C-alpha cells in the first residue's frame, strides 16, 4: 500500500507478502508476524486480518464483522477497522488492489 494512502470503505486490503497471521499455541493468541517482529492480536483484529484477502472491500469486511459482533454499533466498528488497517498499513503490512 502506498505510504500515506488513505484507507476507505472501498479499499480492498490484503496482507503484504512479508506478513503472516499465525496462532501461537503456546500462548493461545493470534500473532501478525513480519520480518523479525510480531504483533499480538485480539480475536477481532485476527478476524479483520483473516478477511484481508484482496477480494473484500473494507466495507465488506465491516459488514461481515457487524453480523458477528451485532452488539457493537456499525459506525464504531467501521471506525475501529479503518484505524486498525491504517496502523498496520503504516507498518507496510497491507497492500491493496486499487493501488
Label for each model-derived stretch:
Residues 1-50, 90, 95-99:
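Acidic, low-complexity/disordered tracts enriched in E/D and polar residues
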Residues 37-99:
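Long, charge-rich, low-complexity alpha-helical segments
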Amino acid at each position: 500500500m502506498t505510504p500515506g494512502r488513505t484507507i476507505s470503505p472501498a479499499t480492498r486490503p490484503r496482507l503484504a507478502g512479508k506478513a503472516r497471521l499465525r496462532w501461537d499455541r503456546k500462548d493461545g493468541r493470534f500473532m501478525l508476524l513480519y520480518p523479525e517482529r510480531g504483533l499480538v492480536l485480539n480475536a477481532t483484529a485476527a478476524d479483520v486480518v483473516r478477511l484481508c484477502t484482496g477480494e473484500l472491500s473494507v466495507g465488506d469486511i465491516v459488514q461481515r464483522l457487524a453480523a458477528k459482533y451485532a452488539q457493537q454499533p456499525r459506525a464504531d466498528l467501521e471506525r475501529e477497522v479503518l484505524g486498525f488497517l491504517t496502523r498496520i498499513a503504516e507498518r507496510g503490512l497491507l497492500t491493496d488492489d486499487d493501488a
